Structures are given as structure tokens and as C-alpha cells.
Amino acid sequence: MKPRDLIARASAWIAELRAQLPLGRRGERAAEKFLRRNAYRIVARNFRAAGAEIDLVAMDGDTLVFVEVKTRRSRDAGAPEEAVDERKQKQIRRAAEIFATRYRADDVTMRFDVIAVDASGERLEIELLRNAF
């Protein structure tokens, strides 16, 4: 492959990622509003540790909830929640352990939820999957 072709491919890939980023942020904002309306208290956003990121950390009563938000424009690539595969779950669990240790929450009940945001229509559709993994 010629360097020029490689640069063109990389540029197209970067442009595609940039186009997706606002959708992801929009989904995270919608998920946060959804959680607040359902009496969750947000304690952290985009927590990064161990090479992973947890989109939202919230309290649901006395339970510390780590929330992964997945947003899709269409289901062509599968349902949003299907993107939270075993590898991603492992990364989130590792980051959650670090969060719990850092903020001395080791003795708190923890849960892992996924929020699937469907952006294929005029309005965002949000589905909460409690205890997703």
C-alpha cells in the first residue's frame, strides 16, 4: 500500500470516529438524565483507570452502580448492549475495583448496569439493563 493510500484510509477512519463522538456524548447525557429522573445520584462521569473508562458511576439507594452507556444510530451492527462484550466487562470490572479502592467503597454493594441508547428515530430510546454483568 502506498503511503498516500494509507494516509487517506487513516484520515477517513479518524473522520468516522469524530462523527461518532458527538453521538456517544449525546447518549451519555441522555443516560445521565434518565438515571437522575429515576432517583440515581451521579457521583462520577468518565472515570478512567487501568486502561478503561466507566461512563457513569452512580448511587442507586445504597448500591454503587457502574454504568456503561452504548449508543447506536442503527441496529445494523447489533444492539447497543451487545458491544459490551466479555473483554469490555473485564476492563470495566478492573476500573470499578480501582474506583472502590480509591474512594474507600470496598464495603458497598456494587452493581454493573448497561444503558442502551437507540438513536435511530427522531427521539432517543433508552433501555436500562440492571445487573447486566
Question: For the regions a protein language model found, what residue spans apply to each?
Answer:
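Structural motif
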Residues: 51, 62-66, 109, 126
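Conserved catalytic cores of phosphodiester-cleaving nucleases, focusing on short active-site segments
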Residues: 35, 54-78, 84-86, 92
